């Protein structure tokens, strides 16, 4: 139990996928203008990364390794992730059409999100077990969602303030992202691996 908690803390806070590994920067900057859209994107990404971590591990262990087809690893991962994203998009279109419309092009782009592809690949290459791979994927995606929602809140607040013209828009977003990264550096000593 303690190992699971350490994995969750280290993947969500200490080794944050956005702020430490620099994966998932496109949705981090693109979907973080509104908190509602950030929450929806974060939840969808959490589901996709968690399921993709398990599914890609299973494809690797049950198909690619026994048949010596490791050269098809990335292609097979993209296909698995695309199927999961299509499932999420279909469910979201039926259940929450407003959120589906708010996420727009970023929802199908989850397929090509480097965090969604990179994390399962890192877990497979790190020889993690199925449980640890899935748990690490869940923790990393929770960290992604946390950072995305916090950053969206910061950007909403900044939109209400009087920002100098030279810093308006993207420059102040980059400065804010840097400050958020500095804040998360405080978690660096939390987990010693």
Curated annotation (Swiss-Prot):
<keyword id="KW-1133">Transmembrane helix</keyword>
<comment type="subunit">
    <text>The complex is composed of six subunits: RnfA, RnfB, RnfC, RnfD, RnfE and RnfG.</text>
</comment>
<dbReference type="InterPro" id="IPR050133">
    <property type="entry name" value="NqrDE/RnfAE_oxidrdctase"/>
</dbReference>
<keyword id="KW-1278">Translocase</keyword>
<protein>
    <recommendedName>
        <fullName>Ion-translocating oxidoreductase complex subunit A</fullName>
        <ecNumber>7.-.-.-</ecNumber>
    </recommendedName>
</protein>
<keyword id="KW-0249">Electron transport</keyword>
<feature type="topological domain" description="Periplasmic">
    <location>
        <begin position="60"/>
        <end position="70"/>
    </location>
</feature>
<dbReference type="GO" id="GO:0005886">
    <property type="term" value="C:plasma membrane"/>
</dbReference>
<feature type="transmembrane region" description="Helical">
    <location>
        <begin position="39"/>
        <end position="59"/>
    </location>
</feature>
<feature type="topological domain" description="Periplasmic">
    <location>
        <begin position="1"/>
        <end position="3"/>
    </location>
</feature>
<feature type="transmembrane region" description="Helical">
    <location>
        <begin position="102"/>
        <end position="122"/>
    </location>
</feature>
<feature type="topological domain" description="Cytoplasmic">
    <location>
        <begin position="155"/>
        <end position="170"/>
    </location>
</feature>
<dbReference type="GO" id="GO:0022900">
    <property type="term" value="P:electron transport chain"/>
</dbReference>
<keyword id="KW-0813">Transport</keyword>
<comment type="function">
    <text>Part of a membrane-bound complex that couples electron transfer with translocation of ions across the membrane. Required for nitrogen fixation. Necessary for stable existence of both RnfB and RnfC.</text>
</comment>
<feature type="topological domain" description="Cytoplasmic">
    <location>
        <begin position="92"/>
        <end position="101"/>
    </location>
</feature>
<keyword id="KW-0812">Transmembrane</keyword>
<dbReference type="Pfam" id="PF02508">
    <property type="entry name" value="Rnf-Nqr"/>
</dbReference>
<dbReference type="InterPro" id="IPR011293">
    <property type="entry name" value="Ion_transpt_RnfA/RsxA"/>
</dbReference>
<feature type="transmembrane region" description="Helical">
    <location>
        <begin position="171"/>
        <end position="191"/>
    </location>
</feature>
<dbReference type="GO" id="GO:0042717">
    <property type="term" value="C:plasma membrane-derived chromatophore membrane"/>
</dbReference>
<dbReference type="InterPro" id="IPR003667">
    <property type="entry name" value="NqrDE/RnfAE"/>
</dbReference>
<feature type="topological domain" description="Cytoplasmic">
    <location>
        <begin position="25"/>
        <end position="38"/>
    </location>
</feature>
<feature type="transmembrane region" description="Helical">
    <location>
        <begin position="134"/>
        <end position="154"/>
    </location>
</feature>
<keyword id="KW-0472">Membrane</keyword>
<feature type="transmembrane region" description="Helical">
    <location>
        <begin position="71"/>
        <end position="91"/>
    </location>
</feature>
<feature type="topological domain" description="Periplasmic">
    <location>
        <begin position="192"/>
        <end position="193"/>
    </location>
</feature>
<dbReference type="GO" id="GO:0009399">
    <property type="term" value="P:nitrogen fixation"/>
</dbReference>
<keyword id="KW-0535">Nitrogen fixation</keyword>
<comment type="similarity">
    <text>Belongs to the NqrDE/RnfAE family.</text>
</comment>
<feature type="topological domain" description="Periplasmic">
    <location>
        <begin position="123"/>
        <end position="133"/>
    </location>
</feature>
<feature type="transmembrane region" description="Helical">
    <location>
        <begin position="4"/>
        <end position="24"/>
    </location>
</feature>
């Amino acid at each position: 139990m303690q190992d699971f908690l350490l994995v969750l803390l280290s993947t969500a806070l200490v080794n944050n996928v956005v702020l430490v590994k620099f994966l998932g920067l496109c949705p981090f900057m693109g979907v973080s203008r509104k908190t509602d859209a950030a929450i929806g994107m974060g939840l969808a990404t959490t589901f996709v990364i968690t399921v993709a971590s398990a599914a890609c591990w299973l494809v690797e262990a049950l198909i690619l390794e026994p048949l010596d087809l490791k050269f098809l690893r990335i292609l097979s991962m993209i296909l698995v992730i695309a199927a999961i994203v299509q499932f999420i998009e279909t469910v979201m279109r039926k259940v929450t059409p407003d959120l589906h419309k708010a996420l727009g092009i970023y929802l199908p782009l989850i397929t090509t999100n480097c965090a969604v592809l990179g994390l399962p690949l890192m877990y497979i290459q790190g020889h993690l077990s199925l449980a640890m791979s899935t748990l690490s994927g869940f923790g990393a995606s929770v960290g992604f969602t946390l950072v995305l929602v916090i950053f969206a809140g910061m950007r909403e607040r900044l939109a209400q303030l009087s920002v100098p013209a030279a810093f308006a828009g993207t420059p102040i977003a980059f400065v804010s992202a840097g400050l958020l990264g500095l804040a998360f550096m405080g978690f660096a000593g939390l987990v010693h691996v």
